[in-house]
Regions:
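Bacterial N-terminal signal peptides that target proteins for export
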Residues: 1-7
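Bacterial Sec-dependent N-terminal signal peptides
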Residues: 9, 15-58, 80-103, 111-126
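Metal-dependent phosphoesterase/phosphodiesterase active-site architecture
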Residues: 125-293, 300-301, 363, 383-517, ...
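Active-site neighborhood of phospho(di)ester-bond hydrolases with catalytic His/Asp-centered motifs
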Residues: 241-243, 300-307, 357, 362-366, ...
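Short, solvent-exposed loop/turn and secondary-structure capping segments
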Residues: 250-255, 312-318, 322-323, 333-334, ...
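Core catalytic region of metal-dependent phosphoesterases/phosphodiesterases
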Residues: 276-388
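Active-site environment of divalent metal-dependent phosphoester hydrolases
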Residues: 310-312, 368-374, 493-494, 528-532, ...
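Active-site-proximal segments of metal-dependent phosphoesterases and phosphodiesterases across multiple
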Residues: 491-556
Length: 701
């Protein structure tokens, strides 16, 4: 009966599945040499130069949120002068690039060929004695880390860091044997299935490299006159954002891996790259940390905009925690064995994650962090199925299930005992594992609160968690007038965004406080705001936030693609920016830098990074699998019937998304805000210009 109830719960939301976002384009912290300032429940976080005595205002609905007062890094507040890294002039290579790089990637698919104890975080291994701004595919082997007498490998990286300013992946389709049109036709007819990953290369499904994307400068919000981008000023904040890693326990019996293709479900829950989801996220963490280490000052903080888990499972949260904090990651569940003998040769093998280091991070909870597969509330039937030993038929005891649904929409998991990790469907027996227990929203928020790293709680507060909410306000850079407001946009029912009136009232109070204090405001949430359709509508939300001229940007995830939008009210506006996911192509995270030019002008640099993984690695394979998946679920909204033309449209759509990848978003703030900013000491080094824009990538000889 429980299985029947589960099936009803799932099928009642079948129109939402499309794997949620894809339709939208207790352990202690390790010992760290950094002071922590933790604000106890009961008050607004202290702002620079302010006490809190008069800040409590009516209308908050009793949900006043404390925050964490940020943890300043040594030297981040006042480092001045030149970057400590010697860099070469910006290359003119783009002018001489082969024009073929700009063509869709057709036919070039084959061109590139119980918790373990947490150790204190290691320093970054030394790089080879060569220009640290030049990277190629020659990998740095970081060797192993010994924990409790066991040697665990650390993932290799390219020999120096790079960003998508230098190079990026592009999807490919077609090979010497099969044209792009042939491949699209095979997919459309069901003769080539998304689960046939061993055949991807044969059909040219994967990636090749193309030149990087320069910053797209957008000055739309400069309301009077544009003096042009100065590329200098004061660096107010330098931080990293990562979103939607959707860490997957690919062996869980309650996954919907047996969804192949159906007219009712546009895209499958199956991801070929899902078996490497921990490796993908760990490589993003490593890449971000290495860039931070190479900068003249480290990142001030990091933002994690939700969906860290795919199925809200306990072990998925634990793997995320380990990769952020540092320690041994074993992406295995059920029977803990070594199906392919030897270390570091299958996706279940344990490895050592170096973690984010001493960079504080702040969380915004996502729908996949608290809902079954991201779109329906966790019920007892889900829990029973996830920790059980049998793959449950989604339609068991559900007589009204129609044949079309049954054909392409069911449960299953990827079998690690086979090198091709085929999907095993309903009825398959597997080892039970209590660590797969799905978490409710409150349990998920508690997991985030107790996660390792800094600051304690990662912005969250236990009193607010107890009420089922994950919103808060904090000052991520201690002693500086920059306020971070984190919203909880989860409806708790489906994958869509929602904004409860009580939270909206709390937000208005926080914005009033920031306005009175002349502070710069950054918002973050998992969802973008266009989907707000409850009591608080998208239009109402935009009008509220845009009426505060000190709000400069709202940072989101969820949609698995890059976008930038102006939100306005009367004569003022702010930027809302969405970041692509880690788990799906193009698998990117993002570096932000907020720069004050002077005269009230703010420049927000956005630079996307891909995982700096060498060719042939698990992560490189995963990115190629992710690119291939676009062709199995990428036909939504495409009316073109010619297969070859349809392939080109999918490639062109991917290229169009890249226009929102690297950006400089410009805006103005009112006089009281910039005069307040000018009272503080800031770094003169614009890391985006002095480091990120000067990196180079060279192919290995």
């Amino acid at each position: 009966m429980k299985h029947a109830l589960w099936a009803i719960a799932v099928l009642s939301t079948a129109s939402l599945v499309a794997c949620s976002e894809n339709l939208d384009s207790d352990h202690s912290s390790p010992v760290l040499d950094r002071d922590q300032q933790i604000h106890k429940p009961g008050g607004e976080p202290s702002a620079p130069g302010h006490d809190n005595k008069d800040d409590d205002k009516p209308g908050t609905g009793g949900v006043d949120r404390p925050g964490t007062g940020g943890d300043d890094k040594p030297g981040t507040g006042g480092s001045e002068g030149d970057s400590t890294i010697t860099v070469n002039p910006t290359p003119d290579a783009d002018k001489d690039k082969d024009k073929d790089d700009e063509k869709p990637g057709i036919g070039d698919g084959d061109k590139d060929d119980d918790k373990d104890p947490i150790d204190p975080i290691d320093p970054t291994p030394s790089l080879p004695d060569k220009d640290p701004t030049k990277a190629d595919d020659a990998a740095i082997d970081y060797g192993t880390k010994t924990v409790d007498g066991v040697d665990y490998p650390i993932q290799s990286m390219t020999n120096a860091p790079y960003t998508t300013l230098q190079r990026r992946h592009k999807p490919t389709i077609g090979s010497a044997q099969y044209s792009a049109g042939d491949v699209v036709k095979l997919i459309a007819n069901g003769d080539l299935k998304v689960t046939q990953k061993k055949d991807y290369k044969l059909y040219g499904l994967g990636t090749s490299y193309t030149q990087g994307k320069p910053w797209n400068v957008k000055s739309d919000l400069l309301r009077w006159g544009d003096p042009g981008l100065k590329r200098k000023g004061k660096s107010l904040a330098y931080f990293w954002q990562v979103s939607d890693p959707q860490i997957i326990d690919a062996q869980s019996p309650c996954r919907m891996e047996a969804v192949v293709r159906s007219p009712y479900v546009v895209s499958s829950a199956y991801r070929a790259q899902g078996i490497y989801s921990t490796h993908m996220f760990d490589m993003h963490v490593q890449t971000a940390r290495r860039i931070s280490d190479h900068s003249s000052r480290p990142f001030d903080f990091a933002l994690v905009t939700g969906d860290i888990a795919d199925n809200a499972q306990t072990n998925e949260f634990d793997w995320f925690d380990r990769m952020m904090s540092g320690g041994v990651v074993e992406p295995d569940s059920g029977k803990r064995d070594d199906p392919i003998a030897g270390p570091n040769n299958d996706f279940t093998d344990p490895y050592y994650a170096r973690g984010l280091g001493n960079i504080p991070w702040y969380i915004a909870i996502g729908n996949h962090d608290n809902l079954y597969m991201g779109f329906t509330p966790i019920q007892d039937a889900h829990r029973e199925a996830c920790i059980g030993d049998t793959v449950v038929d989604l339609f068991d005891s559900f007589p009204v299930a129609s044949a079309p649904f049954r054909e392409g929409y069911n449960n299953g998991f990827q079998d690690a005992s086979d090198p091709d990790s085929p999907v095993r469907g309903p009825g398959t027996k597997t080892a039970a594992d209590a660590r797969r227990m799905p978490l409710t929203k409150i349990e998920a928020l508690q997991k985030f609160y107790n996660a390792g790293g800094i600051p304690q709680g990662h912005g969250l507060d236990l009193d607010t968690i107890a009420q089922g909410w994950g919103y808060y306000a904090t000052y991520p850079i201690e002693g500086k007038p920059i306020k971070l407001i984190t919203l909880d946009t989860n409806s708790g029912k489906f994958s869509e965004a929602d904004m409860a009136p009580v939270q909206n009232a709390w937000l208005k109070n926080q914005l009033d406080i920031a306005k009175d204090r002349h502070e710069l405001v950054i918002l973050q949430s998992h969802h973008g705001t266009s989907g707000f359709n409850g009591e608080v509508t998208a239009q109402g939300f935009h009008q509220l936030v845009a009426s505060y001229e000190n709000v400069i940007v709202h940072i989101t995830g969820h949609g698995h693609s890059n976008s930038s939008t102006i939100r306005t009210s009367k004569d003022h506006g702010y930027w809302e920016v969405m970041l692509a996911s880690v788990v799906d192509f193009p698998s990117q995270s993002r570096i932000f830098e907020i720069v004050y030019e002077g005269d009230g002008i703010i420049d927000i640099y956005l630079t996307n990074i891909e995982p700096n993984a060498p060719r042939g690695s698990f992560v490189d394979t995963a990115v190629q699998y992710a690119a291939a998946r676009r062709f199995f679920g990428g036909f939504k909204g495409i009316t073109e019937t010619d297969p070859a033309k349809r392939a080109i449209i999918i490639l062109e759509n991917a290229e169009a998304e890249s226009e929102h990848m690297n950006l400089v978003l410009r805006t103005r703030v009112p006089k009281d805000v910039y005069e307040n900013l000018e009272k503080y000491k800031w770094s003169n080094v614009i890391e985006s210009e002095t480091l990120l824009n000067k990196l180079k990538f060279e192919e290995s000889k």
